[in-house]
Regions:
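Alpha-helical transmembrane segments and their immediate juxtamembrane cytosolic regions
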Residues: 1-264
Length: 264
């Protein structure tokens, strides 16, 4: 039996509500990122653009969790897609069963958010804690850092300033140990060496910190008119994995034997 939870249709959401557009953009940036991994030897510029995908998916997930009338169905759709996508994810990006795709993270984040919203028997505390415990036993794309990022954005959802502060603060922390991006498509980022300001700018140009490139898309209200069926928003994820497999076979020098070896 599904629990009763009043949807927050009048709940303030400070960011962009044009989620069909954001999901489409997220998929495009994720495809660029995965093409960089699968076909272009981890080309840095493509990985940079790929950092935009997770924040867009995270914000769309938050909007969906606030708006949904059926949280269990929302969670179930994500979990089903995650399970169905896993073999494709393994074949497209040469991962093993132990490395789970991003839809598992989004499903787990949904469980954490709905536990916070439910507020029954202290669920706002033990619900997220259980989700972190699951991450201790499962290797899921983006891991505990990704879950923390999504929860911070959820908690700051009602304030544009709060969203920006939570986003930038956590992105700076998350990216601090990743490599500094000093060139972009052959253009040297000379301002990173400016006296006095170079170190400050450099903090924002670590690879993972460059997720901040998604922030204007989240904060700027748009009205694209694009309407996407509920199932299609995340349903495009496995389709892009099929495309990656085909491209690897056609242009990446991969063979079927090599692609299915991930199941061994």
């Amino acid at each position: 039996m599904e629990w009763e939870l009043r949807p927050g249709r009048d709940e303030r959401l400070a960011g962009n509500l044009d989620t069909s557009l954001l999901k489409t953009l997220a998929l495009c940036f994720m495809l660029i990122d995965h093409l960089g991994v699968a076909l272009f030897g981890n080309l840095l510029e493509m990985r940079v653009l790929g950092r935009i995908a997770l924040p867009l998916y995270a914000w769309c997930l938050i909007v969906g969790n606030v708006k949904t009338r059926h949280p269990l169905r929302y969670f179930g759709r994500l979990l089903l897609l995650a399970v169905l996508s896993q073999p494709l994810y393994m074949m497209a990006l040469s991962h093993s069963w132990r490395h789970l795709n991003i839809l598992f993270l989004l499903a787990l984040a949904t469980a954490a958010i709905q536990s916070i919203r439910l507020r029954r028997f202290g669920s706002q505390f033990w619900g997220p804690a259980l989700c972190y415990l699951v991450l201790g036993f499962c290797e899921i794309d983006y891991g505990w850092r990704g879950l923390t990022f999504i929860l911070l954005l959820y908690l700051a959802r009602g304030s544009r300033g709060g969203l920006a502060a939570a986003f930038l603060g956590y992105a700076l922390f998350w990216g601090s140990s990743s490599q500094t991006v000093t060139t972009f498509f052959g253009y040297e980022l000379g301002f990173l060496r400016w006296p006095g300001l170079g170190d400050l700018f450099s903090a924002f140009f670590h690879l993972q910190t460059l997720a901040w490139l998604a922030l204007p898309l989240i904060l700027t209200r748009t009205s694209s008119g694009l309407k996407m069926p509920k199932w299609l928003g995340y349903g495009l994820y496995p389709l892009h994995l099929v495309l990656l497999i085909v491209l690897r076979l056609m242009f990446g020098g991969a063979t079927w034997a090599g692609i299915i070896s991930c199941f061994h």
